[in-house]
């Protein structure tokens, strides 16, 4: 995995470790997937250093990409049965919907929370629960605007099913959008993910849907902002 969250109860570092943590909190590190997008404009800036406008454009683009691919540190809650937001963004939908057919979860609607990621949000996705990965399926599709209701059905997506230690199935779906045309998923079947663990990335925004078992209590509303790995979006039955 790209980066694991700090488990609750972890002792605070001291000395140099404490200083490093302070720097990480002030300046979030870069996700490895963003490295080419930062190095390329830096190279342009270096080659065109004698031309002010080229140098400025290269440095500005590199800074923007570094911001887009930032990977901030997060600390998930330690409450039993909670589901955390799989991404930073804005809650777009809180409803009931049929999970992606490729996950074989049946045709009955399940509670769902959809989070829309803009180009200014953090692009990484984090495991909404701790558990074992049972399915990972990539589905080709269209690239409609991710804020449309039917984007979850027709757009390119990557669906992952996680089984918690209590036997609950939670599905999390990365959905490509109008600008986001590259979905990355590092998790594989059999992997054991801690809650809040980084497992994937959608380049330049998009949407992430989470499907819950029946009886789950949803704790967010449309329009609410979420912080990946920290905002509690639901309580499992």
Curated annotation (Swiss-Prot):
<feature type="modified residue" description="Pyruvic acid (Ser); by autocatalysis">
    <location>
        <position position="206"/>
    </location>
</feature>
<keyword id="KW-0444">Lipid biosynthesis</keyword>
<feature type="site" description="Cleavage (non-hydrolytic); by autocatalysis">
    <location>
        <begin position="205"/>
        <end position="206"/>
    </location>
</feature>
<keyword id="KW-0472">Membrane</keyword>
<dbReference type="InterPro" id="IPR033175">
    <property type="entry name" value="PSD-A"/>
</dbReference>
<dbReference type="GO" id="GO:0004609">
    <property type="term" value="F:phosphatidylserine decarboxylase activity"/>
</dbReference>
<keyword id="KW-0865">Zymogen</keyword>
<protein>
    <recommendedName>
        <fullName>Phosphatidylserine decarboxylase proenzyme</fullName>
        <ecNumber>4.1.1.65</ecNumber>
    </recommendedName>
</protein>
<dbReference type="GO" id="GO:0005886">
    <property type="term" value="C:plasma membrane"/>
</dbReference>
<dbReference type="InterPro" id="IPR003817">
    <property type="entry name" value="PS_Dcarbxylase"/>
</dbReference>
<comment type="pathway">
    <text>Phospholipid metabolism; phosphatidylethanolamine biosynthesis; phosphatidylethanolamine from CDP-diacylglycerol: step 2/2.</text>
</comment>
<keyword id="KW-0670">Pyruvate</keyword>
<keyword id="KW-1003">Cell membrane</keyword>
<keyword id="KW-0443">Lipid metabolism</keyword>
<comment type="subunit">
    <text>Heterodimer of a large membrane-associated beta subunit and a small pyruvoyl-containing alpha subunit.</text>
</comment>
<feature type="active site" description="Schiff-base intermediate with substrate; via pyruvic acid">
    <location>
        <position position="206"/>
    </location>
</feature>
<keyword id="KW-1208">Phospholipid metabolism</keyword>
<keyword id="KW-0210">Decarboxylase</keyword>
<dbReference type="Pfam" id="PF02666">
    <property type="entry name" value="PS_Dcarbxylase"/>
</dbReference>
<keyword id="KW-0456">Lyase</keyword>
<comment type="function">
    <text>Catalyzes the formation of phosphatidylethanolamine (PtdEtn) from phosphatidylserine (PtdSer).</text>
</comment>
<comment type="similarity">
    <text>Belongs to the phosphatidylserine decarboxylase family. PSD-A subfamily.</text>
</comment>
<dbReference type="GO" id="GO:0006646">
    <property type="term" value="P:phosphatidylethanolamine biosynthetic process"/>
</dbReference>
<keyword id="KW-0594">Phospholipid biosynthesis</keyword>
């Amino acid at each position: 995995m790209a980066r694991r969250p700090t488990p609750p109860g972890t002792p605070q570092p001291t000395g140099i470790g404490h200083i490093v943590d302070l720097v990480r909190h002030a300046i979030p590190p870069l996700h490895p997937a963003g490295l080419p997008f930062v190095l390329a404009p830096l190279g342009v800036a270096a080659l065109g250093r004698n031309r002010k406008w080229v140098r400025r454009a290269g440095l500005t683009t590199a800074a923007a990409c570094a911001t887009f691919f930032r990977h901030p540190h997060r600390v998930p809650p330690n409450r039993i049965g909670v589901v955390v937001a799989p991404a930073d963004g804005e809650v777009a939908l809180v409803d009931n919907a049929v999970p992606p057919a490729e996950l074989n979860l049946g045709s009955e609607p399940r509670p769902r929370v959809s989070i829309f990621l803009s180009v200014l949000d953090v692009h990484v996705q984090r495991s909404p629960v701790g558990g074992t990965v049972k399915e990972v399926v990539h589905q080709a599709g269209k690239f409609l605007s991710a804020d449309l209701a039917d984007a979850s059905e027709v757009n390119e997506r990557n669906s992952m099913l996680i089984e918690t230690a209590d036997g609950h199935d939670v599905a999390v779906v990365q959905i490509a959008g109008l600008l986001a045309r590259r979905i990355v998923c590092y998790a594989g079947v059999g992997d054991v993910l801690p809650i809040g663990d980084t497992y994937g990335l959608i380049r330049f925004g998009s949407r992430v849907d989470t499907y819950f078992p029946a009886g789950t209590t949803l704790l967010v509303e449309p329009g609410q902002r979420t912080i990946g790995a920290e905002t509690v979006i639901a309580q499992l039955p």
